[in-house]
Amino acid sequence: MKLKFTKMHGLGNDFIVIDAINQSVSLDPATIRRWADRHFGIGFDQLLVVEKPGESGDFRYRIFNADGGEVEQCGNGARCFARFVRDHDLTRKNTIRVETACGIIMPTVEENGEVSVDMGIPRFDPARIPFITQERALTYPLNVNDREIEISAVSMGNPHAVQIVPDIDLAPVTSEGPAIESHPFFPEKVNAGYMQIVDRTHIRLRVFERGTGETLACGTGACAAVVSGISRGLLDSEVQVTMRGGNLRIRWEGEDQPVWMTGPAVSVFEGTIDL
């Protein structure tokens, strides 16, 4: 049996997107890992699945990392998801109500082809991240590889640990990122973000993603970094986030308000693969 897919990317964070409404799809972790292999498979950071919704959305959005594990949220993927359902005539709406494992998101396809996404309200309560600590704080000490670092912990539907560094080009992303990802204080693992503040409206960012490794861009990581910077009084409410794959615009008006992310979503090619 052959399965149709579309290869897409958001700032180099790449995906395959599968329509599970108009074709039968059955996935398992071993199959996803095989397809994710960049030498023997298709190659991607995440696999995105478009499904019929429950009662509250237009579509249901499922996300699987390259290691085969299902995760709650992916910001760059959300933009690609929205472009996919529009480009494949699954909807004519500009603003789409999408069900995810962590709640409803509302992507809007703009006239210029970019996609803006209401990413929901960030969570700082340690129990909801989840993060093991005695009480909520702006920053937390974390012992990693025999040194203490200072992080902010926030959930954007998935957990993030964000630290400020003087120069992200020199940050120990690949050597330290895996230790943060698997730190015992994060029982569901965590995405490790490294943020360099250029000024109050501009940051540079690298992210070691849970279950994937470092990617060229991370949408939820950009949201988490900006939210942590605003919470600490270091950033304004609208910030440009520069990652190795390109730029996102993130806007957040403060606690109990949703985070808005705007950026590109690009289709690369369509193909079929044997199940």
Curated annotation (Swiss-Prot):
Protein residues bound to substrate: N13, Q46, N65, G75, N76, N158, N191, E209, R210, G219, T220
Pathway in which the depicted protein is active: Amino-acid biosynthesis; L-lysine biosynthesis via DAP pathway; DL-2,6-diaminopimelate from LL-2,6-diaminopimelate: step 1/1
Active site residues according to the UniProt entry: C74, C218
Keyword Isomerase: yes
Enzymatic reactions: (2S,6S)-2,6-diaminopimelate = meso-2,6-diaminopimelate
PROSITE patterns: DAP_EPIMERASE
Top enzyme category: isomerase
Assigned keywords, A-Z: Amino-acid biosynthesis, Cytoplasm, Isomerase, Lysine biosynthesis
Gene Ontology CC terms: cytosol
Transport as UniProt keyword: no
One example GO MF annotation: diaminopimelate epimerase activity
A single BP term in Gene Ontology: lysine biosynthetic process via diaminopimelate
Site (Could be important to modulate the pK values of the two catalytic cysteine residues): H160, E209
Domain of life per record: Bacteria
Family indicated by similarity: Belongs to the diaminopimelate epimerase family.
Known role: Catalyzes the stereoinversion of LL-2,6-diaminopimelate (L,L-DAP) to meso-diaminopimelate (meso-DAP), a precursor of L-lysine and an essential component of the bacterial peptidoglycan.
Assembly notes: Homodimer.
HAMAP family tied to this protein: DAP_epimerase
Protein name (record): Diaminopimelate epimerase
Species per Swiss-Prot/TrEMBL record: Nitrosomonas europaea (strain ATCC 19718 / CIP 103999 / KCTC 2705 / NBRC 14298)
